[in-house]
Amino acid sequence: MELENIVANTVYLKAREGGSDSNKGKSKKWRKILQFPHISQCINLKDKLDISYGYVIDQQPIGRELFRLFCENKRPVYFRYITFLDEVVKYEIEYISNRIFIGHDIGRRFLDVEAQLELRNGSGGDALDAETQEELLLNSSNANPTETAETEHCNNTTANNCNNINNSNNSQHSSDINHKKLDTRNHNGDDATGNGSSHQDDGDESVKCQEGHDDAEKGGGGEGGGGGKCVPVGGYPDELVLDVLNDDLIAQVRNKLNSGGKDIFAQCVNAVKAFLAGEPFREFESSMYFHRYLQWKWLEAQPITYKTFRMYRVLGKGGFGEVCACQVRATGKMYACKKLEKKRIKKRKGESMVLIEKQILQKINSPFVVNLAYAYETKDALCLVLTIMNGGDLKFHIYNMGGEPGFELERARFYAAEVACGLQHLHKQGIVYRDCKPENILLDDHGHVRISDLGLAVEIPEGEMVRGRVGTVGYMAPEVIDNEKYAFSPDWFSFGCLLYEMIEGQAPFRMRKEKVKREEVDRRVKEDPEKYSSKFNDEAKSMCQQLLAKSIKQRLGCRNGRMGGQDVMAHPFFHSTQLNWRRLEAGMLEPPFVPDPHAVYAKDVLDIEQFSTVKGVNIDESDTNFYTKFNTGSVSISWQNEMMETECFRELNVFGPEECPTPDLQINAAPEPDKAGCFPFRRKKKQPARTQPIPIPEHLLTTSHSVSSTTVES
């Protein structure tokens, strides 16, 4: 290995690991870079931003956290509603075997609902929704021995608890003590948050001693377990959210509690959010917590330049330039910077393609698609700063990890599930990918995969179709080759090619390194059936055959438009293991392979071919309009997540004693006087311009009472 490559890899790995200091890659001046402005300098953002509950709370990570802090510290009466929403989220991503008990717990604590606890085995009783029936099938399918044993243990414990509860309810009825209920939160030794604890009767009929409960139950909002405490068996009266729910909603929940359906609390959630979007949100808008939100938004809107980042080794190259690793100086977070050379873009007339890719990346916020964090320009290039994927691409892992090419079925199934989720997220936004292949599916540090390189993606208006012969030879669908109109069907054909290649170790219509003309590959795609070896089981073969159908009408995933991914996810190929789709989307399932954190899954620096200099192209004033549209700086959700993940939010988001405003949050604060010193002739340190108070228009000191401020996104 060349010395240049060794040095480049060493520096890059050190940056990835957070450096050798306690700042974890942050600049020594990071606090100065992220210093809050005085509130008077950013309160005018109220006129420019979407100040609605649906945006500030539902979509903005920092807004959501500040609203939580406001409710917890200033208006505890509202915190019960936040806790209810948190518990419903935990409920929705739980396995069916635990969900029924958690549902009963939520019903008792927040809705004052009691229902006889019953086991459901997929038949009889309450009608189960499609997803719940699917999970029951998964739970009864061929899981590994450990999972099966855990499930059996859980079911046995469930049966015992069910009998205990029913007997308890009968005895309570006979003794006419309706307010004394049996708490079954820890039916298998775990509470709703997964913290281990045990519940034992202390002899008092009206209370049970519970240990290890999360802070949310105490009104604290944290997730760590606390010490032991005594809780009324019927739950806390001050946890009830009945005042914002009508009797019909509560009755619907009562009737469905034993079904374990994922959405039984959905309408209650909407009602609670509608309440929070009213008076609670208006109170929040008048508080220092909302002013702190405006300060964060001011920082988020600051110009982004090349000085924002440190640049490291080249990782690869694209059509318009190279991709290199970079690190944000203020936070230490690593990204991949895709540099698009201005002259090369202009020479190839790729302005429209570049802008579409940028706009699509900015629109998508998915854990299965690389996210855009920043978009900025330099003198010579347009730069997209994206999620860095340190684990390499699937093509590398299929062919270059030693042994026989391809993956075992379980690993292929896991990657296929995550890619299917990514395609579904794109399709829901009306975006067709058009370039699904192993090179474009990247692994992160933890072994999860994401879709990358959206250069060929295009947005399709509702009910319309597009035409375009674009893609990669051997992965293009027959309708693309024939230049016919299509919607989302090409993505599911390419997905079938990807799944086939992961299992077989070669593409379905072209052998690895086979020298064959493009026309011959296109003919095979349109006419030849693919061949299946013993590596495929019946479910895998069936799925590939349905995905690789020549006719759109017969192809899996192509019958329900933007929601075609649901048909793909419902295929038996994904039923032969305990795959919980919501836990997958929440990143709670363990990947089958974790990349080596000390390895660089990229070509040597000297092996990455460099671009030649573009000649005969000049950049002039006519190009500035395009560059202005591109250069939009930080992407809101990605930037806020970065602040929280790197703990910048925790370290900077401090208030005064007893939750009082700090000087930068005091509306009528006077300028800080100069400190007197021993040397009057010394050079005075100027107060940073951003921290100096300025006059505030009166209308900005009142809350917004527009309709948008109470809009809740369902």
From Swiss-Prot:
Superkingdom to which the source organism belongs: Eukaryota
Chain segments carrying region Disordered: 141-229, 667-714
Keywords linked to the UniProt accession: ATP-binding, Developmental protein, Differentiation, Kinase, Membrane, Nucleotide-binding, Oogenesis, Phosphoprotein, Repeat, Serine/threonine-protein kinase, Transferase
Residues of the RGS domain: 53-174, 177-294
Record keyword Thylakoid present: no
EC number from the UniProt entry: 2.7.11.16
Annotated ranges, domain AGC-kinase C-terminal: 577-642
Annotated localization: Membrane
In-chain residues carrying the UniProt-annotated modification Phosphoserine: S612
UniProt biased composition (Low complexity): 154-175, 698-714
Region (N-terminal): 1-308
Protein name, as recorded: G protein-coupled receptor kinase 2
